Amino acid sequence: MSHSPDLKGSSFTLSVLHLCNNSVDTAIEFVKEKVEQAPAFFAAAPVVINIANVEGDLDFVALKQGISQAGFIPVGITGAKDKRTQNLASDAGFAIMSASKSPTQAPAKMAPTKIVRTPIRSGQQIYAKDGDLVILNHVSAGAEVIADGSIHIHGTLRGRAIAGASGQKEARIICHDLQAELISIAGNYWLSDQIERQFWQQKVMLSLVDESLHLEALTQ
């Protein structure tokens, strides 16, 4: 084993904040609301800011400061239209990022399904890397279950369930009693107040259809 530092390329799933105009106040209020709605999920979360749709100059210093104070960690800027904009963002402390255009790669080999038989209590986090996650019990409020694949919960989901954590859009979330704080697939999420009441406390399946979350009731 080498005792020297090593520098390697890698990839991560990050949240992207898409700005529609150059109003810094609007952007900051938006991220503040998100952190207040789900502080355990968003607090200290890294975020990339996409400015491709912004017309006019942005106050990058105020943007970075405001997003940081709201609770996020601003990582960088993407979608800058010219070198001048890139320089302004860089001078404010933002990294300049671009979407990768790497060739299509074979899907990673899935790991065996992770099965948990005990209740997932508040404050606990369970992660199934490169595979599916099966919970044969309840997930309490304040608990978090994460999988790079799909999640099956044979009990009540009161906490947070995050499937497709590495970007797998075909992932699903199936639970026998939906009372979640947050449900997410491949970075798309709903908070509890965004879940239609007809699906509350029901056996359901969550999927991603045309880049939008879709819930359907399952027969018992």
From Swiss-Prot:
Fetch the Pfam families from UniProt: MinC_C, MinC_N
Annotated signal sequence is none
Q: Which UniProt keywords apply?
A: Cell cycle, Cell division, Septation
Under the heading SUPFAM superfamilies, the entry gives: Cell-division inhibitor MinC, C-terminal domain (SSF63848)
**Superkingdom of this entry's organism?**
Bacteria
- State any GO BP term from the record: division septum assembly
- InterPro entries for the chain: CAP/MinC_C (IPR016098), MinC (IPR013033), MinC_C_sf (IPR036145), MinC_N (IPR007874), Septum_form_inhib_MinC_C (IPR005526)
What this protein is reported to do is described as: Cell division inhibitor that blocks the formation of polar Z ring septums. Rapidly oscillates between the poles of the cell to destabilize FtsZ filaments that have formed before they mature into polar Z rings. Prevents FtsZ polymerization.
- Tell me how this protein assembles: Interacts with MinD and FtsZ.
Q: Which family does it belong to?
A: Belongs to the MinC family.
- PANTHER family reported for this sequence: SEPTUM SITE-DETERMINING PROTEIN MINC
Name of the protein described by the UniProt record: Probable septum site-determining protein MinC
Gene from which this protein is expressed = minC
